Structure formats: C-alpha cells, structure tokens
Amino acid sequence: MQHNTFLPNDAVEEQKQNPYYGILRAVETDLRLGQRWCELKVHVLDIDLKTKRPLLSGIPVNGQLKDKLQYVLPLYLQETISIEFLSSVFDSMKKLSLPLVKDARGLSGDEFFLYLGIMCSDSTIVYYKITDGLIKPRQNDEE
C-alpha cells in the first residue's frame, strides 16, 4: 500500500493535545509537501519537568542535504529561546539516543546540529541551522 503524501503524518495527529500541535503540523506539512522530505517522524523531547516539545526528523530527497537524516525543531516567531534552551534540546536528543547529525566543519569534529523551523505571522516557515558547538564559517565554494 502506497502512502498518500497529501495526508498528515499519523504521528503528528497523535500530538493533538500537545500545546505545540499547530506549529508541529505547519512545519511537518511544509517539510512533506513544500520541501519534499520523506520518512518524517515525530519525537517528543523532555526539555524540563513541564515542557514536552515535538521534534521532527526526516530525509530530504533533493538538494545538498539529499538522503541525509535531518532534525527540525518547530518554533513560533514570538517564542524566546536562549542558549540554555538550545542546550537542553540537544541534551534531550542525546537522552532519546537519536542518531545525531554531525557537522564536519566543527572545531572538534563532534558538533551536532539541527534546524529551527520558525513560523512567521504570515505562515511562512524559515529554517535556521543551529549547531551544538563552534564551527568554522562555510566558504562560498563549499556545500
């Protein structure tokens, strides 16, 4: 049986009681239909005692990230994030034993990264790469 890419991911629908369901669904829809990612999965991160945040993982089918597992943390534009928050996100990912994606340009070679999927007030979603550590800037001729 072939999966209909126009239907929402069942794992997203299971998160209807999560306060971040709206942004999760918007980012998942953009990744699935707009960016054409496949194998989308929802993970739930325990950021602190009272905060459970959804995290999406998937594989882009074209572009520079083709066939490489990626993670996206859905956020609203008006949310305030801090270095401590981002650190707790990476720590939560490690606790779930998720296969983390490394950035080879990192100073130690062990820097992990994910993308923030930020939804603006007009429903536009922008993606920012966040790294757990320091990396050297990318040159124009590098991928």
UniProtKB/Swiss-Prot annotation:
It comes from the Eukaryota. The keyword S-adenosyl-L-methionine does not apply. GO terms for molecular function: nucleic acid binding. The keyword tRNA processing applies. GO terms for cellular component: cytosol; nucleus; tRNA-intron endonuclease complex. One of its GO terms (biological process) is tRNA-type intron splice site recognition and cleavage. Non-catalytic subunit of the tRNA-splicing endonuclease complex, a complex responsible for identification and cleavage of the splice sites in pre-tRNA. It cleaves pre-tRNA at the 5' and 3' splice sites to release the intron. The products are an intron and two tRNA half-molecules bearing 2',3' cyclic phosphate and 5'-OH termini. There are no conserved sequences at the splice sites, but the intron is invariably located at the same site in the gene, placing the splice sites an invariant distance from the constant structural features of the tRNA body. tRNA splicing endonuclease is a heterotetramer composed of sen2, sen15, sen34 and sen54. Interacts directly with sen34. This is Probable tRNA-splicing endonuclease subunit sen15. The gene is sen15.
